[in-house]
C-alpha cells in the first residue's frame, strides 16, 4: 500500500505538460548528403503531437493527440488511447506523423483525411521522430541526437506507434529509395538542432519526392510541409507501420 501511495504522489507531483506547437521544416528543391544531418522519410502524414500523462495505479495513462494547430483530435483516433503502455516514462510529449497504411503497405492520404474528418476506416498509427518533454523535464534545448536517443529508449514499438529510424549522411540515397517506394519525400534535420516550437526553421529541410513524370508524390492531408501536408498510410491489421518502414534502407543514427 505504501508503494502504491508513493507512486500516486510521484505522478501527482509532475508539472502540467506544456502547450506546444510543432517545429516545421523549410523546403529544398533537391536532396543532399551531409555529415551534419540525419535523414528520415517524410511520410506525407498528418503532423501531430502526442501527450502522454502520468499512468494511474492500473497502468493506464492519459493520452492526448493534437494537430499542428493545437486542436485536440484524439477522439478521431480511439486506437491510440492505449499508447501510454508503450511509453516507458511517467509523462512525455512526442512529435511525429499520423498515417493510415493500405494493404500494400503504402500510406493512404485519402484514408487518413477521412479519419481526420471522423469517418470510420482502417486504423491509424503514429510514427514518432522526436521527444519534446520527458518525465517533467523539457527536452527542447537538447540536440536532436540526444532527443532521438531518449525516444528510442522509452518507446516500445507496436502496431499503433513506432519510433522512425534515420540514416546518417546519405540523403541522396534515401531520397532515391523514397521515390522508388512511392514515399512522399525526405526530411533532413541538423544533428545538433534544438527544438523550436512553432518555428519554420532552416535547421530542418524537406524535399518532396518527384518521380520521373515530374509531379510530387505527396497528396492530401496535413504534415510539416506547406500548408501542413499529407499522409502515407494504409495496411493490414498485422504490423503495417513496420512494413512501411522496412521499405527503406536505414542505418541507425
Language model regions located:
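Catalytic cores of nucleic-acid ligases and guanylyltransferases
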Residues: 1-253
Amino acid at each position: 500500500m505504501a508503494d502504491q501511495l508513493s507512486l500516486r504522489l510521484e505522478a501527482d507531483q509532475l508539472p502540467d505538460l506544456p502547450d506546444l506547437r510543432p517545429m516545421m521544416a523549410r523546403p529544398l528543391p533537391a536532396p543532399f548528403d551531409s555529415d551534419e544531418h540525419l535523414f528520415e522519410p517524410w511520410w506525407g502524414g498528418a503532423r501531430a503531437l502526442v501527450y502522454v500523462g502520468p499512468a494511474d495505479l492500473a497502468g493506464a495513462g492519459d493520452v492526448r493527440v493534437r494537430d499542428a494547430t493545437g486542436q485536440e483530435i484524439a477522439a478521431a483516433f480511439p486506437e491510440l488511447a492505449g499508447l501510454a503502455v508503450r511509453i516507458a516514462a511517467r509523462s512525455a510529449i512526442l512529435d511525429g506523423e499520423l498515417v493510415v497504411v493500405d494493404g500494400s503497405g503504402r500510406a493512404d492520404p485519402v484514408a487518413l483525411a477521412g479519419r481526420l474528418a471522423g469517418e470510420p476506416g482502417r486504423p491509424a498509427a503514429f510514427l514518432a521522430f522526436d521527444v519534446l518533454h520527458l518525465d517533467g523535464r523539457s527536452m527542447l534545448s537538447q540536440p536532436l541526437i540526444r532527443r532521438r536517443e531518449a525516444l528510442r529508449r522509452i518507446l516500445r514499438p507496436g502496431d499503433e506507434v513506432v519510433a522512425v529510424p534515420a540514416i546518417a549522411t546519405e540523403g541522396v540515397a534515401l531520397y532515391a529509395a523514397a521515390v522508388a517506394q512511392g514515399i512522399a519525400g525526405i526530411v533532413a534535420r541538423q544533428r545538433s538542432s534544438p527544438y523550436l516550437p512553432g518555428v519554420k526553421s532552416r535547421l530542418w529541410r524537406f524535399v518532396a519526392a518527384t518521380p520521373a513524370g515530374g509531379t510530387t508524390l505527396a497528396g492530401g492531408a496535413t504534415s510539416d510541409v506547406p500548408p501542413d501536408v499529407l499522409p502515407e498510410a494504409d495496411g493490414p491489421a498485422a504490423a503495417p507501420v513496420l512494413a512501411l518502414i522496412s521499405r527503406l534502407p536505414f542505418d541507425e543514427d
